Structures are given as C-alpha cells and as structure tokens.
Curated annotation (Swiss-Prot):
GO terms for cellular component: mitochondrial outer membrane translocase complex; pore complex. Channel-forming protein essential for import of protein precursors into mitochondria. Specifically required for nnt-1 accumulation in the mitochondria and may be involved in the secretion of daf-28/insulin from the mitochondria. Required for embryonic and larval development. This is Mitochondrial import receptor subunit TOM40 homolog. Residues 1-20 are annotated as: Disordered. The keyword Protein transport applies. Belongs to the Tom40 family. The keyword Transport applies. GO terms for biological process: monoatomic ion transport; protein import into mitochondrial matrix; protein targeting to mitochondrion. It comes from Caenorhabditis briggsae. It is found in: Mitochondrion outer membrane.
Amino acid sequence: MATPTESEFAAPIPQTNPGSYEELHRKARDVFPTCFEGAKLMVNKGLSSHFQVSHTLSLSAMNTGYRFGATYVGTNQVGPAEAYPILLGDTDVNGNTTATILHQMGIYRTKLQGQIQQGKLAGAQATIERKGRLSTLGLTLANIDLVNEAGILVGQFLRRLTPRLDVGTEMVYQYGKNIPGGQISVLSYAARYTANHFIAAATLGASGVHLTYYHKQHDNLAFGVEFECNANVGEAVTTLAYQTELPEEGVTMRASFDTNWSVGGVFEKRLSQQLPFTLALSGTLNHVKAAGKFGIGLIIG
C-alpha cells in the first residue's frame, strides 16, 4: 500500500470526485421534514466569524430540558463555503454530550465522533476518507472495545464511471461475544444517476433495498421519494415528500406521507425581514393508530 505523499495532503479535491458513499441518498432525504413535538425555543448567537453558540429549550412529553451547543469553523478554506477544521458539540444539564470533529488535509478527510451518556462513553467513531479524481475510499471504526473484543468496521468505495453515473460498494463487519458465531459481515452495492433535474440512487444488499428519487421541479419546488425494504423483519415502506419555498415571504414548507398512513409536515415562516426571528410549526398524524403530535418553535438567529 502506497504511503500518502506531502502533495496529497495539500492538493484540493478534484471537481470530478463523486463524494462520500454515505451521501448517496442525501439529496432526496433533505426534502423530508424533521418533525418535532411540544414547544421549542432556539437561540443562535455568532460570537465571531468562526465561533457560534446555541441555546435550545424543549418542552414535550418525551424530552424536556435545556441544551447548549457550540460550533467552531477554522481558517483553512478549501472551497467557496467550506473551511476546516470544524468542531461541533452540544450538552444538556445532566452532562450528556455529543461532539464531532471534522478536518480535511488535501484529499484526505477525517471525522471523529463521540457521545457521553450518564457519565459513560456511549459511542465513539472515527472515519477517514481519501477523495481522488474519480473515486472515494472510506474506512470507519465504530465502538471499538479492546477489553471485550467488540466493534464495527465499515469499508466504503464509490467510483464515478461517467459524468452522470456513480457506482460503489460497502462492507460492514461486526464482531463481539454477543453476536452469534462471534462475527458477522454484510456486503451491499450502490449506484447513483444524476441528470439535469433529478437524481436516482439505489442501495442493494442482503439486509434489504434502499431506493431514493429526487426531482427538482423548479427553483422553489422539489420532490423526494424513498423506498426502504428490510429483509430481516420483512417490512417495506414507501415515502413521498415535497419541499416548497416562497423566498419573498420567507416561507419554507416540507411535508411527507408514507404507506403506513403517516403524514408529517414542518412549516417555517420568517417573521421579520430586519430581525432573525423564524416561527416553526410541526405536525404528524398516523391515520391507522389515530395518533397525532404537534409542535411549535421559535428560532432566533
């Protein structure tokens, strides 16, 4: 295996790079609403051009409390709106903390994630990617426990075959004493086709099928369709979503419904052109279970 050269740590990522394997379905998923329940107040405050903090107060039956978050963006500019390193973190009053560190050195990109729950390390993950001219190679180590001999290893490869077609593969390997046989591995394959106004992506493996379709009708209207089939439990769900924007009115609406007869939506309205106040309304309804949830939020900053 060739060792990285000094020029590779300084070279920019080529424009023809297909991106990360984990972002295959991201474009369609961005259309889907992120619904919430209860009342939420979020205040974002930029302390400098590189440092920002946030305060979030939530009131709901499932989650009531306060969270503090901080974001730092470094000075290493690698794109028009992309700079590294990036440090993200948030914590609540009980000390439950999540943190993420992102850094890019030339064609190499690293990501470190950690989570602390009730004073104990609940999860840790490290990822490194090599982004070449036409391909991305990634390796992830998750929850590696040297004492109990357990952990998860994920290898990913994404290759650009034509300007519109990308193909890839992923291998997930998990080992541990609580796994039948001591270890298990799952291999899956993926493809993505990008056209002028739509993106279609597919992931196929022994555990199931994941299909997404993104369609941009025009600048302010987009649709997303997702099909997920889990072969292990014998379930399949299809979800249709849309996102529409009215920039002049400061309005963004996202909504979705699926084959389980669940409907959800998030409506966001900028209250003032001079002040950074945004009102968010969220609602979900399952017609089969006759269960619904409602949320209201105010975002400042």
